[in-house]
Amino acid sequence: MHSDAPTPVANELSEVSHLAEGDNASFSAGNFTVLQLPSDPSHCIDYAIPAGTLVIVDPNNPDNNRTVKLQAPAVFRPQCALGGTRAPAPRPEESFPDWSEYQKYHHNDRRDPFYGSVTPIAYTIAASTVTAWMLLIILFLSRKPSPLFQKIAVLITAVSLTVFLAQATDTLESQYNEGYQNAYELRHKIMGGWAFRILQVITCVITWLARLQVVIRLFDVPKINTRLAVVGSTLIFTNATIWACLNLIPPWSQYVRNAKSVLPVFGALCSLLLEVFYLVVVVIYSISKRKYAYSRTSIVMAAISWLAMILPMVFIVFDIAHYWIAGWSDFIRWTADAAASVVVWEWTNVIVYQERREQRQSVLGRQVYRDEILDFKGDNGGGTVGGGRTKYPSRMEEDDVPFRSSPNDHHFTSNIPTSAGEGQSFQFFKRARLPMYSRKIWKIARGESAASNNTHYEHAIIEEEEEESIERNRRTPTVQENGEEDDEETYDEENDQYSQDNHSSVHSFESSRPSQHPVPSSGGTRAVGHTHFPLPGQSEGAHTTSPAAAAAAAEPEPEPVAGPSGGAAAHGDSDDDSDNSDDSSLASFTVIQQTGFSVDNQGVPEYDADSAPPTFEPIPGFHRQDYSDAKG
């Protein structure tokens, strides 16, 4: 638009700048057009103007319209009262004939870089929203259940990003209709509202709680899980408190930073510390399971998991280094934080599946640690929680033992006849003598085949230096594949018969009372080992004998019974003249392995539908009254 107003000289740019002051001032030049000049002093910017005719139009006051003839390229600088953040340059049009002249002096145009424009913001919001909804669909379509916090975190992330995408679309459409693009306005429209600030704090807490669930699943040792939970919870709520102060307490804001305040930097460092903590824990787990974590079938899942864990750390560093990246990197961080829990959880499922499949095909089975308690009460306490953590059985309701148990006790349930009647539950508790940190190695025997349903657990051997001398003098009974114990036979000259010296392990005790040999039941049972337990209130060297036990000892010795495989019985006769007669108060029972009972790869017993749970067959002559007499 040209006017007939008098043309001022070319060097009167100060007058041009003065006339351009105003909220709705606009001007046009030969090569491009600015529809509206910035009215906020913080939006001041220099505009490169090539040679040509410059027409200044003031819609509020047409009398102020001026036309300037520029003989050479120039720079238009509004006389703003204050300096501040520069707004992007006006939108040029390549259709103008002097576009090449404008390109020559493009270096004078102080527009924001491309990564600070509206384009990265639009792309990142759209891509992050699509990724979040895909994660949510995968999470709910998965056959295995996912943690509750994980579902809530992904759902909130997907809904929040959808709301932000709608706001960004409306703002970009408004700017397009007015003929300009302003990244600052777009960021302020999305991130300046209370919805974004509140959702950011809530999503931060729930997402990190979902990650904490993943961390707790990775380790089966309860003490390690407790420590990780305490450290992780402390870091999570500290980080949430910092970001709540930055977003909810004015005048602090995440994007309007005060150089004198260290709170934004401290919050970023706290977030970085959380990311490192999560990464280190997952790396330790993946190294311990490297055979399964980085196999050919799981290498793709491992790469995606690493990418999801590293991306938030990279963008946190970028946010600290450069201001403009914070305008769109937050959306990537939101999606990456949600994916870091979902993808790592699925990666763990792949690792556990491969490990279980190999353990079912192997001979040794799975490892059992010191802190794990194997529950043999069937459906009452068996089973696992999450990804393989052993479920700790509580004190059993039907237990009428007159002393209380602790989490360190080993539970052995028996079908010993009690005063309440035949078949009532009876339970022995063997107190753990060694500290919690000592590990337990279970001797495992396989019967007839290498399948996991033939796994039998024997006595526990404690790896302690002070027990080395005891281990050299004692031999732990082993279980052969036919179910019989390999005991040494000695000749008793006085009684003119052979007897077997039953050596006990660290946690077992010998009884001088003649041992009785169980007869296999019709269900195809097999004796897999025997354990002797002292009665409560009696020590190993006690010299007291209950009347019932004395009567049982006076009974005639039965004939040896053949074992399940047709050979001699696993237990022989002990020496009647030995010095161990003071141990007659010790109760002895034999574990009977029934057909259909198996131990799965998690160390939890499983039963077939047509078979009964495993029982403990007592020594004949030992009754519940003996237990009461011994305790009294």
From Swiss-Prot:
GO cellular component: plasma membrane
Membrane topology of this protein: Multi-pass membrane protein
Function: Required for the proteolytic cleavage of the transcription factor RIM101 in response to alkaline ambient pH.
GO terms of biological process kind: cellular response to pH
Biased composition (Polar residues): 497-524, 590-601
Biased composition (Acidic residues): 482-496
Protein name: pH-response regulator protein palH/RIM21
A Pfam short name: PalH
Primary localisation category: membrane
Cytoplasmic side: 142-145, 211-228, 286-297, 353-632
Sequence similarity: Belongs to the palH/RIM21 family.
UniProt keyword list: Cell membrane, Membrane, Transmembrane, Transmembrane helix
Compositionally biased intervals (Gly residues): 380-389
Compositionally biased spans, kind Basic and acidic residues: 623-632
Transmembrane segments annotated in the record for this chain: 121-141, 146-166, 190-210, 229-249, 265-285, 298-318, 331-352
PANTHER family, alphabetized: PH-RESPONSE REGULATOR PROTEIN PALH/RIM21, PH-RESPONSE REGULATOR PROTEIN PALH_RIM21
Membrane topology (Extracellular): 1-120, 167-189, 250-264, 319-330
Protein's UniProt keywords contain Metal-binding: no
Disordered: annotated segments: 380-419, 462-632
Biased composition (Low complexity): 546-571
Places the protein is found: Cell membrane
